[in-house]
């Protein structure tokens, strides 16, 4: 398989393959950029599309083929591209198209060469797994022998080999990934050789530290402790507004504290290494695979951590797994659902949900709505974008129309990567603007209280059990008396690589908004309508 990626086949230094691959007799599937490369090297033509496709689309299967065997002729798929195949290579035939992409799937069955413009590997291509299965088992002749649950014994052996006679110190967050990695390492080495530390950064949600202490106190049998470091993190983040800079600072501060703990605890005798709950999407989004674009630097993928990896002083037992697979491993380990069903929470915590602004700036009127004077991180064409946010004044009723409209607006406006809708406000949208702001104890507490309201109401209503994650984002947009606003960002996903924005029932939304607007300093409540891609789940 030749994967998608942020490059263009016309860029100098873009990834390529030996053209002899396509006459080797091996079955080849090109996905997105991989399809472009296959077409160009086989004598076709690739052009930059008139408009990109970022989000859901409908594939119309033009010709029956083994790749789409047992599937409907119309398929919901997921697009993230601008370049597209304009002319089929000799020997290829058209398999499918979308409304804006005339060549969305192609094949040369004689040479077993297949190309798809969409992404079958993401869960939002509804039957993408079956397409991949058709390629693997019907075209390539592979056998089914992968089951993450059956890998526990193998993973334990890998941990023992990686660690050797040394011991392991874990930094723990209380999330699913670090909990499963920690528990798995204890099972492989025994509790006396695995210690856990939770760094209280001062950036956590309400009640988070108490929850983590209870969870790991029961798992760790006395080898778990909490390191207070709130003042250090807040000092390091003072005046920092760039989201990538925030992530790097937090990651480096974690490394500094790790070194301090190692020295203080006499862990520097060479017998201790660092353990982490890094999973595969962390590596991809940090540009950690050969040709991946940096979308966001994950806090456990900064330079300091990379140096530890190079020095062979780190073990990451889950680095090849996705979130859904990690949960399956956790169940096999006997961890309770109260831990495994927790929504994902970013390592940098509330720091990347507390957006900052350099200067005062009003909202700007455009044809489709209002441009908010802030920017958010997105992923478009498999690469990172950092662009303004479009706000709509009305909150539509029909969920599907709402999400479809957001996708169309982004595809039509190259300068944005996210669409929000105003739910409730103390002042009209044209009267709000940004204020100079940074991460401060006051703003963090405002966000903490807002997040607690949202989590409580989502749990009481059962809404949190119907979604993957519910970020609550504080943005420095408001008026002089109420300088901040809140963005609600509920999404549904399986592995975090793609996500659908989810609409909640209006009665719950109204109740949530009323409680949020009763908090001091909050001006408005917005609702994020954007899928991933083109937006990332987190705003930073």
What residue ranges belong to the model's regions?
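ATP/NTP-dependent adenylation/nucleotidyl-transfer catalytic domains that generate, transfer
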Residues: 139-540
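Flexible gly/pro-rich beta->alpha loop and the following alpha-helix that scaffold active-site loops
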Residues: 1-31, 35-36, 40-42, 133-144
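Conserved hydrophobic/aromatic beta-strand scaffold that supports enzyme active sites
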Residues: 56-58, 103-105, 115, 389-391, ...
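A conserved amphipathic helix/loop scaffold
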Residues: 78-80, 86-97, 328-329
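Beta-strand-turn-beta hairpins that frame and shape the catalytic cleft
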Residues: 73-74, 91, 108-113, 384-386, ...
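A glycine-centered loop/beta-turn motif at secondary-structure junctions
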Residues: 88-91, 97-141
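A conserved active-site-flanking secondary-structure segment within enzyme catalytic domains
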Residues: 19-22, 26, 36-77, 82, ...
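Proline-centered loop/turn at the N-terminus of a beta-strand
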Residues: 25-29, 76, 93, 112, ...
């Amino acid at each position: 398989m030749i994967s998608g990626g942020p490059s263009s086949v016309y860029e100098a230094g873009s990834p390529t393959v030996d053209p002899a691959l396509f006459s080797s007799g091996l079955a080849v599937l090109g996905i997105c950029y991989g399809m472009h490369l296959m077409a160009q090297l086989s004598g076709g033509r690739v052009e930059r599309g008139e408009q990109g496709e970022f989000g859901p689309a409908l594939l119309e299967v033009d010709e029956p083929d083994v790749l789409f065997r047992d599937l409907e002729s119309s398929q919901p798929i997921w697009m993230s591209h601008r370049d597209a195949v304009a002319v089929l290579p000799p020997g290829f035939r058209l398999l499918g198209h979308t409304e804006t992409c005339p060549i969305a799937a192609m094949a040369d069955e004689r040479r077993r060469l297949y190309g798809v413009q969409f992404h079958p590997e993401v869960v939002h291509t509804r039957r993408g797994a079956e397409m991949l299965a058709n390629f693997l088992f019907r075209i390539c002749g592979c056998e089914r022998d992968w089951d993450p649950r059956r890998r526990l014994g193998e993973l334990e052996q890998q941990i023992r080999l990686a660690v050797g006679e040394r011991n392991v110190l874990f930094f723990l967050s209380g999330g699913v990934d670090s909990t499963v990695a920690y528990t798995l390492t204890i099972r492989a080495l025994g509790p006396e050789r695995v210690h856990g530390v939770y760094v209280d950064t001062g950036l956590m949600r309400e009640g988070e530290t108490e929850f983590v202490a209870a969870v790991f106190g029961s798992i760790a049998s006395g080898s778990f402790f909490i390191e207070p470091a709130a003042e250090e993190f807040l000092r390091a983040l003072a005046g920092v507004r760039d989201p990538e800079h925030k992530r790097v600072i937090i990651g480096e501060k974690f490394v500094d504290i790790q070194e301090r703990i190692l020295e203080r605890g006499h862990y520097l005798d060479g017998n201790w290494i660092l353990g982490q709950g890094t999973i595969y999407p962390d590596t991809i989004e940090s540009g950690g695979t050969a040709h991946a674009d940096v979308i966001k630097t994950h806090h456990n993928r900064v330079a300091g951590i990379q140096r530890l990896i190079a020095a062979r002083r780190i073990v990451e037992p889950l680095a090849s797994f996705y979130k859904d697979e990690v949960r399956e491993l956790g169940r096999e380990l006997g961890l309770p659902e109260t831990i495994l069903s927790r929504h994902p929470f970013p390592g940098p915590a509330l720091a990347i949900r507390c957006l900052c602004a350099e200067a005062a700036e009003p909202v700007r009127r455009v044809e489709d709505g209002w441009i908010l004077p802030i920017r958010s991180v997105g992923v478009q064409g498999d690469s990172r974008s950092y662009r303004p946010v479009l706000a709509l004044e009305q909150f539509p009723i029909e969920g599907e129309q709402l999400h479809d409209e957001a996708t169309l607006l982004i595809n039509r406006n190259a300068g944005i990567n996210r669409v929000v809708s105003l739910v409730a406000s103390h002042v009209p949208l044209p009267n709000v603007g940004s204020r100079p702001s940074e991460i401060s104890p006051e703003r963090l507490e405002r966000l903490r209280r807002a997040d607690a309201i949202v989590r409580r109401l989502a749990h009481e209503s059962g809404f949190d059990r119907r979604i993957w994650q519910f970020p609550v984002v504080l943005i420095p947009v408001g008026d002089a008396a109420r300088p901040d606003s809140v963005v609600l960002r509920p999404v549904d996903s399986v592995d975090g690589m793609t996500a659908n924005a989810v609409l909640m029932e209006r009665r719950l939304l109204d109740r949530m908004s009323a409680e949020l607007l009763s908090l001091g300093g909050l001006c408005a409540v917005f609702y994020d309508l954007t899928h991933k891609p083109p937006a990332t789940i987190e705003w930073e």
